[in-house]
Amino acid sequence: MNAITIFFIILSTVAVCIIIFQLYSIYLNYDNIKEFNSAHSAFEFSKSVNTLSLDRTIKDPNDDIYDPKQKWRCVKLDNDYVSVSMFGFKSNGSEIRKFKNLESCIDYTFSQSTHSDIKNPCILQNGIKSKECIFLKSMF
């Protein structure tokens, strides 16, 4: 084998490895790709999508949390959805922030609320017997 043959063998091996890495990346993100395609299928033949797309894979508040109890989630409380974790509820000042549907709760929790107030009703005086504190304890 001469040097040119070895060079082309190495080059073809690198090319095959890059293709395998790309296929694996597509495999890992297949659900996100399907979601994007279904959301933008109406714009298939347009020059640009011309809409804002929310990519929750960039920054997620749960990325750096390893304890499942501390992870943020949207759950139903009475007839509304709330953002809850072991720390408490996401709030807008003194009241728990409530959402009419699950999608708006998810959008707020995982995109808009990077630095929002958190209300824990269990640390307030007489809050241990409140409905919100009992609900929070039942979640964990």
Swiss-Prot record:
It is a single-pass type II membrane protein. Its main location: virion. One of its GO terms (biological process) is membrane fusion involved in viral entry into host cell. Residues 22-140 are virion surface. Changing residue 10 to V: In strain: Isolate Neethling vaccine LW 1959. Keywords: Disulfide bond, Fusion of virus membrane with host membrane, Late protein, Membrane, Signal-anchor, Transmembrane, Transmembrane helix, Viral envelope protein, Viral penetration into host cytoplasm, Virion, Virus entry into host cell. It is found in: Virion membrane. The chain crosses the membrane at residues 1-21. It holds the Pfam family Pox_A28. One of its GO terms (cellular component) is viral envelope. Contains two intramolecular disulfide bonds. They are created by the viral disulfide bond formation pathway, a poxvirus-specific pathway that operates on the cytoplasmic side of the MV membranes. Belongs to the poxviridae A28 protein family. Envelope protein required for virus entry into host cell and for cell-cell fusion (syncytium formation). This is Envelope protein A28 homolog.
